[in-house]
Amino acid sequence: MPFTLGQRWISDTESELGLGTVVAMDARTVTLLFPSTGENRLYARSDSPVTRVMFNPGDTITSHEGWQLHIDEVKEENGLLVYVGTRLDTEETNVTLREVLLDSKLVFSKPQDRLFAGQIDRMDRFALRYRARKFQSEQYRMPYSGLRGQRTNLIPHQLNIAHDVGRRHAPRVLLADEVGLGKTIEAGMILHQQLLSGAAERVLIIVPETLQHQWLVEMLRRFNLRFALFDDERYTEAQHDAYNPFETEQLVICSLDFARRNKQRLEHLCDAEWDLLVVDEAHHLVWSTDAPSREYMAIEQLAERVPGVLLLTATPEQLGMESHFARLRLLDPNRFHDFEQFVEEQKNYRPVADAVAMLLAGNKLSNDELNRLGDLIGEQDIEPLLQAANSDRDDAQAARDELVSMLMDRHGTSRVLFRNTRNGVKGFPKRELHTVKLPLPTQYQTAIKVSGIMGARKSAEDRARDMLYPEQIYQEFEGDTGTWWNFDPRVEWLMGYLTSHRSQKVLVICAKATTALQLEQVLREREGIRAAVFHEGMSIIERDRAAAWFAEEDTGAQVLLCSEIGSEGRNFQFASNLVMFDLPFNPDLLEQRIGRLDRIGQAHDIQIHVPYLEKTAQSVLVRWYHEGLDAFEHTCPTGRAIYDSAYASLINYLAAPEETDGFDDLIKSCREQHEALKAQLEQGRDRLLEIHSNGGEKAQQLAQSIEEQDDDTNLIAFAMNLFDIVGINQDDRGDNLIVLTPSDHMLVPDFPGLPEDGCTITFERDVALSREDAQFITWEHPLIRNGLDLILSGDTGSSTISLLKNKALPVGTLLVELVYVVEAQAPKQLQLNRFLPPTPVRMLLDKNGNNLAAQVEFETFNRQLSAVNRHTGSKLVNAVQQDVYAILQLGETQIEQSARALIDNARREADEKLSGELSRLEALRAVNPNIRDDELAAIDSNRQQVLESLNQAGWRLDALRLIVVTHQ
């Protein structure tokens, strides 16, 4: 190699040393000093792993003094390069900069600079980079972004609500689905979309204290959202790190009590600039015109400051009109400010609901009915649509659907309230109750007697709670020596049931964790029954493992023993047998227990087994739940109201189960109350709202489209390629499960989202739903998104050299493959990627500038190429640098047309879509006051900013590959 003192070279193997200077040489060796690190390297002159650094006109370089020069001309004097150009800080022209004075900390970021500096990547990394660009761009443009990555069944009504609300600016809605229909999942889907698109970055979830862990688990397991749980201890700890502790985390969960009981804490919450507020169990916020509760006022303060609000609540009919109005008032106080006016409005919606029922029935409409429809819709030129809807023509159904849609748009609360009922949603199993009456052992009888004497001063409620769990009473007297499981007939019955149903999965729920642990030991030691335990003393990871073991079909646990609190937020639809070893104290907890199996998507009828001891509180409660509320075999929306009204009487019967006088009358009265309330609820059903919330055929198509996207084989191929190149070990465990573990030779020390001890993944939704320890990998999973960012945010794969063996072309023929990226810079909230994501434009140029990309598809071409080692590659680049530079110049002139076309299309699409949305909502505003002014203003502002950002869009070279033809 021709070396001269003062020349600048870069090491092919140690590029982190920066720019080296030739400081000494003899006949066989050359010494380079690397000023940025102060290190010297001695190389053999004949075959040294270094590359000469040469810049070209158009490049910008930095001097050792820090000023920059835009190169206009390159000269050579005595073997040294001299750059002539314009100094950027002073705008002085014809400034010269000798290469010896270049900044030694030079970083080559442009692909062409890296190529010319000998920083040549492996060929497979270039291919990965191109695929990453291509797939990322496609995913940004895919419909239903944000709805595909969650670990949930694809349930149409949930997807419909999430798709509608998740795309809105700062959504403010009330989710009021009946129990078991998945309000938490709907809220999670909305959050996931908003966070993924950048519409929201900071989220606060406020829930009752008992549901905090349930939300934490659901958000992490289903949506890969890592929330921080704030309690008194965490709040105090965070005060050391920031004036406002809530600014230390982006995603926060706290309890309503935690938020309410401290004035400064509430102020900190209000000042933390959240984008979205989620409030679960919002029906517990008590409000009246004269005296709103402190809890309600706390949420009201937050709702005034946070742009987006999701309230999750029980069904409106259960709560009464005033309570329902109070929720809506939190969402839009300007719209819902007068309760009397609201009541009047609700009455006026009845004709609208009747009209929709008429249209959906499909019968011919009378003239009066047609006139009524015309009056309700109140639009000009509606006559042809009405005639079409009432005809036998092929378009009659489409016309009816259009009329239903127009009526829904005029429905008072359809934009702010979503409510699905079990009647309107298919897919629920039946419930079958099997009660097993068992004798009360003498040991328990004695313990109960003694307890009654000693606890005479206890309240009726405390005695009632004690009587529900006789094993606890016995254990208290006997201490550690008490072995209640040796004589309790429920244990014998359970062992008999499990041994006679060994092929079936059984979920056993009991109130206390200690009971679950003791039962596990008995089942294992006496009958060798494989039982997993699940209780609140376990970590989330331990619970995951227990759930995964229970889910395994062949080698897994037959039974899962859960405590009351431990089972919150977990669903086990793959099992259909539920054993209640004891009974919970109120109907809400009973429904929660059954709800572990009775979920939409359950494939079998649920068998509910209740072994109970006679002459105990259990025998009282089993009758009251079944005969008084019908709560075992059907969901019981009336349960809480009747429980509250019958509480005093019920407690007395539970505290003294032997006193049965009048109990039959109580059951009869509760049953009558239940039937009356149920009829009242049914009559008050808002069928129009249910149709709107359910989504009908549109929601079915949405679920089907996402299911089709689940079968994308590109994802699996790309993910495995990514893991290979990053250096992540993959161990195929069968059953569509793969274990990923970090290796010692990864591209980065820590791959974001991959735990130190690894993780189990699956690409199959069904597997992910039955195996909670397996992460469900989609294009939206953090492992894939982080992998894309890792490759594309750096220079991995941005420059490479390949050989093309092709005897039809002359040896030494050059081709240059260029990958440009067309993109626009804008704040994430604008969601510019909907219209112009970073889009790759591939060109394959010969020396004359002919673009062969259309004729030669990337993957086919890539398979024909072979790799070149870095050292040989550097020599090749040095030999053809001027030719490559000339082809690059031709590429620069050609890219503009393609890029401009992409940008113009994006502008047109953005303008049409955003202007159309604005026009539709403005027109609707005239007939539906629930469309907020701030929402319209935000859409208009968003449209202007999007179009302005697209005007500023540009393009840049992202990667290049030099291809040299060979015949060997």
Swiss-Prot record:
Superkingdom as given in the UniProt entry: Bacteria
Decide whether keyword S-adenosyl-L-methionine is in the record.
no
Q: Which residues bind ATP?
A: 177-184
Which Gene Ontology biological process is one annotated for this entry? regulation of DNA-templated transcription
Q: What SMART domains does the annotation carry?
A: DEXDc, HELICc
Transport found in the keyword field: no
According to the entry, every stretch annotated as the Helicase C-terminal domain falls at: 490-685
Motif (DEAH box) on chain: 280-283
Task: Give the EC number.
Answer: 3.6.4.-
Query: Which key words are in the record?
Result: Activator, ATP-binding, DNA-binding, Helicase, Hydrolase, Nucleotide-binding, Transcription, Transcription regulation
Q: Which CDD domains match?
A: DEXDc_RapA, SF2_C_SNF
Gene Ontology terms for molecular function: ATP binding; DNA binding; helicase activity; hydrolase activity, acting on acid anhydrides
Helicase ATP-binding domain location: 164-334
Could you tell me which InterPro entries the record lists for this protein? Helicase_ATP-bd, Helicase_C-like, Helicase_RapA, P-loop_NTPase, RapA_C, SNF2-like_sf, SNF2/RAD54-like_C, SNF2_N
The similarity annotation says:
Belongs to the SNF2/RAD54 helicase family. RapA subfamily.
What function is annotated for this protein? Answer: Transcription regulator that activates transcription by stimulating RNA polymerase (RNAP) recycling in case of stress conditions such as supercoiled DNA or high salt concentrations. Probably acts by releasing the RNAP, when it is trapped or immobilized on tightly supercoiled DNA. Does not activate transcription on linear DNA. Probably not involved in DNA repair.
Quaternary structure annotation from Swiss-Prot or TrEMBL? Interacts with the RNAP. Has a higher affinity for the core RNAP than for the holoenzyme. Its ATPase activity is stimulated by binding to RNAP.
Q: Report the protein name in the record.
A: RNA polymerase-associated protein RapA
Q: Which species is this UniProt entry from?
A: Salmonella newport (strain SL254)
Instruction: Name the lineage.
Output: Bacteria, Pseudomonadati, Pseudomonadota, Gammaproteobacteria, Enterobacterales
